[in-house]
Swiss-Prot record:
It comes from the Bacteria. Residues 1-13 have a biased composition (Gly residues). The keyword Cytoplasm applies. It is an enzyme of class 2 (transferase). This is Ribosomal RNA large subunit methyltransferase E. It comes from Sphingopyxis alaskensis (strain DSM 13593 / LMG 18877 / RB2256) (Sphingomonas alaskensis).
Length: 230
């Protein structure tokens, strides 16, 4: 998940073609070939990030100025850890707590909870691990895709709405929220909630998002506080 000179990630070098092995499906061969030829994958390996998604947050930060002023950050869907790596690199003094059902290798300065964010105990556990309220909540969570665009969209919007509810309940005034959504037109309730509680709400698709991917990110800044929303 996860400075950037040249947002395209660089496209130099050889194109790698992968032959389909006897026990490898055509789809897995295509995935492997895409990975081997992805400039962001190569950059992540060269620069020590755990995933190409790191560059999505880097690019969002370049556009919206999210990280350097943040002192306490919650990373929802932290595994494999690329986004928290970006946070720590941009702001080594920031306190960071992340949560994921999947295991995540330790990251210096980051408290990692291996549990379901949808668990009723998760919000309090995150705030305790962080040591107080956050001023930035970031979420790269996405439901496992089933290949049906509208279903995938609705499931991921559901996660984003839960993440937004956590942010509204816990953010410090002036804080910000970033979450992955899929294009599909069912995000009205999410946007209504965010516009009620934040001064600015925008969508962005960072260059690191794969071409043809339906993913977008919603960026809400200037949290009004729980008592000040119109």
């Amino acid at each position: 998940m996860s400075g950037s000179g040249g947002k395209g990630g660089g496209r130099g070098g050889l194109h790698v073609r992968v032959k389909t092995a006897k026990r490898r499906s055509v789809s897995s061969t295509r995935w492997l070939q895409r990975q081997l030829n992805d400039p962001y994958v190569r950059r992540a390996q060269a620069e020590g990030y755990r995933s190409r998604a790191a560059y999505k947050l880097i690019e969002l930060d370049e556009k919206f100025g999210l990280l350097k002023k943040s002192r306490a950050v919650v990373d929802l869907g932290i595994a494999p850890g690329g986004w928290s790596q970006v946070v720590r690199k941009a702001n080594p003094r920031a306190r960071v707590a992340g949560i994921d059902l999947l295991p995540c290798e330790p990251i210096e300065g980051v408290a990692i909870l291996e549990m379901d964010f949808m668990d009723d105990a998760a919000p309090d556990a995150l705030i305790a691990a962080l040591g107080g309220a956050p001023d930035l909540v970031i979420s790269d969570m996405a439901a496992n895709t089933v290949g049906h665009p509208q279903t995938d969209h609705l499931r991921t919007i559901g996660l984003a709405e839960t993440a937004a509810d956590f942010a509204v309940r816990n953010l410090l005034p002036g804080g910000a929220f970033v979450a992955k959504v899929f294009a599909g037109g069912a995000d009205r309730e999410l946007l209504t909630l965010l516009k009620r509680h934040f001064t600015t709400v925008k969508h962005a698709k960072p260059p690191a998002s794969r071409k043809g991917s339906p993913e977008l990110y919603v960026i809400a800044q200037g949290f009004k506080g729980r008592g000040d929303a119109a």
